[in-house]
Amino acid sequence: PTGKEIHLTIRSQLILDVDEKVNVDISKQEGAGEKEIISAKISDINANQNVRINGTVVRVFPPAFYDCCPQCSRKAANDKCSDHGDVKSAPAIVFSFVLDDGTETVRCTAFRKIGEQIAGLSAKDAKEKSENPVLLQEEIDNNILGCVIEIEGSVKDNKQFDRMEINISSANTNLNPITIAKQLTSK
């Protein structure tokens, strides 16, 4: 076949801006797309895996913030989005913590809505409260420190700090202890 081949990710967007008719054949490559999510212990995780882990939040780091486009959630410096031009940017949160599952610990990072869910605060409220970082940290600690949560995310090898880390794609902060006990005793 003749033509051009373009490789896209799940977040890619292809916009055709041509006058002539274009025949587009979209096919998914074998093995491409979402990786299988595996339930794992922290001691067993490896880079490039998508994992589901239950654990206790044992350390919480102060959140970071950046401005994002309200339409696409990408970073918007000085109220300018690379895709949407001038926008009224909204604060977005980056929230990190350490999760312990009894086998090891791992640093986990959540962005935007998932970060808000885990921290128990909206990015807007957290950013406003960040003017008093001690009170903000205390509130977040009270919301999540010591809680058992389930996360799903992709494992990354942080070579700078020589450790595995997880970028969270979803989180469940309302686990049922009876269900967890049944899962643990059935293994």
Residue ranges and their predicted role:
Residues 1-187:
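Single-stranded nucleic acid-binding proteins centered on OB/S1-type folds
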